[in-house]
Amino acid sequence: MARYLGADCKLCRREKMKLFLKGSKCESPKCPIEERPYPPGEHGRTRAKESEYLLQLREKQKCARIYGVLEKQFRRYYEEASRKTGRTGENLLRILESRLDNVVYRAGFAASRDQARQLVRHGHFLVNGRRVDIPSYRVSENDVIEVAEKSRELTPFVIARAVAGERTVPPWLEVIPNRLRILVHSLPSRQVIDTPVQEQLIVEFYSK
């Protein structure tokens, strides 16, 4: 599956905010946006006032970058969200949150969504007892996700056990650190999704 291969820190500077794409580096003084809080490029410091369309485009791109999803798949998610009952923007965020790589990240088993994607691809997770190596796999209510027995002593999971409790886990998930297990109690409502996006701008972008 295609994925973005450029510099993650440039994406944060382009959006003028931390997207937390680099794990612990984003929390440190070494984060480039701390030293250069303006978009990359020769004219990054003097960016012109953005049009309504550009604001909508940037919000769509920001959301896709946060979750590590490229345009073709992101649009498919939007189209699926628009067919569901309820608010399209909230449906879209719920779909993105239900991706297996995001759940692994939210549970604290990976430092970033990118690392979570790699761990899933390498076959380190079971969902309801069956190995799943597709990062975009969508979890459902009452699913049980756990680290495969053969993978439990790998460094990311040793760290996950050691720092359990230091990271806030969203209320729709439950983590059992000593068993490296994640319980999906429900899919999230908008109120508990802390992704810093204005989803209505994304809806307006695709509605044109």
Curated annotation (Swiss-Prot):
One Pfam family hit: Ribosomal_S4
Matching CDD domains: S4
The UniProt record lists the keyword Nucleotide-binding: no
Domain of life (superkingdom): Bacteria
GO biological process: ribosomal small subunit biogenesis; translation
Domain S4 RNA-binding, first and last residues per copy: 98-163
PROSITE patterns: RIBOSOMAL_S4 (PS00632), S4 (PS50889)
SMART domains assigned: Ribosomal_S4 (SM01390), S4 (SM00363)
Listed GO CC annotations: small ribosomal subunit
Signal peptide interval: none
Molecular function in Gene Ontology: rRNA binding; structural constituent of ribosome
InterPro entries, per the entry: Ribosomal_uS4 (IPR022801), Ribosomal_uS4_bac-type (IPR005709), Ribosomal_uS4_CS (IPR018079), Ribosomal_uS4_N (IPR001912), S4_RNA-bd (IPR002942), S4_RNA-bd_sf (IPR036986)
Keywords, in A-Z order: Ribonucleoprotein, Ribosomal protein, RNA-binding, rRNA-binding
Keyword Flavoprotein attributed: no
HAMAP family for this protein: Ribosomal_uS4_B (MF_01306_B)
Protein family membership: Belongs to the universal ribosomal protein uS4 family.
Oligomeric and partner information: Part of the 30S ribosomal subunit. Contacts protein S5. The interaction surface between S4 and S5 is involved in control of translational fidelity.
NCBIfam families, per database record: PRK05327.1, rpsD_bact
Function: One of the primary rRNA binding proteins, it binds directly to 16S rRNA where it nucleates assembly of the body of the 30S subunit.
Protein name: Small ribosomal subunit protein uS4
